[in-house]
């Protein structure tokens, strides 16, 4: 959703760089419904941008249950977390309020990062082909 609100931010850069970097951008149906619900609050330009970038997302299955204890994430965010844990290498979010405690240690091996921190990590590891964002 953040990619819809700013043409210059890290979220937008991730969409721009995904193909050349070999990144698959994943979202569950639940995540897409959340974006469709929330993007209009960002205005008409954000709605148009959502229509453009939504087609770049690979749909993954919603995961609604998890086999291990989960206590620090609100129920409304668990489908996002569980789906990412089942299918992704990293969960990117700006939702520090609900995912902040997991941004330090991750979730059962799944790193949870802000988009800008993800780009910094990739650049520092020498995996980011483009040096300027």
State what each model feature region is.
Residues 1-27:
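Short, well-structured N-terminal submotif of metal-dependent ribonuclease cores
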Residues 2-5, 66-72:
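Short, flexible loop segments at the rims of nucleotide/cofactor-binding pockets, characterized by
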Residues 19-69:
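PIN-domain endoribonuclease scaffold, especially VapC-family toxins
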Residues 21, 53, 87, 106-108:
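Short, structured coil segments at secondary-structure junctions
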Residues 24, 91-93:
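Short hydrophobic alpha-helical runs that function as membrane-insertion/retention elements
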Residues 29-30, 94-96:
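Short secondary-structure boundary segments
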Residues 70-74, 97-133:
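Acidic, PIN/NYN-like endoribonuclease modules and their adjacent C-terminal/linker elements
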Residues 74-90:
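Acidic, metal-associated active-site segment
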């Amino acid at each position: 959703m953040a990619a819809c609100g700013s043409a210059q931010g890290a979220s937008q850069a991730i969409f721009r760089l995904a193909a050349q970097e070999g990144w698959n951008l994943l979202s569950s149906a639940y995540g897409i419904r959340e974006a469709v619900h929330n993007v209009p609050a960002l205005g008409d330009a954000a709605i148009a941008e959502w229509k453009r970038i939504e087609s770049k997302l690979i749909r993954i299955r919603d995961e609604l249950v998890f086999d291990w204890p989960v206590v620090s994430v609100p129920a409304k965010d668990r489908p996002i977390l569980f789906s990412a844990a089942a299918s992704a290498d990293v969960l990117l979010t700006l939702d520090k309020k609900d995912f902040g405690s997991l941004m330090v240690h991750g979730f059962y091996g799944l790193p949870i990062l802000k988009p800008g921190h993800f780009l910094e990590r990739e650049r520092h590891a020498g995996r980011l082909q483009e040096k300027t964002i």
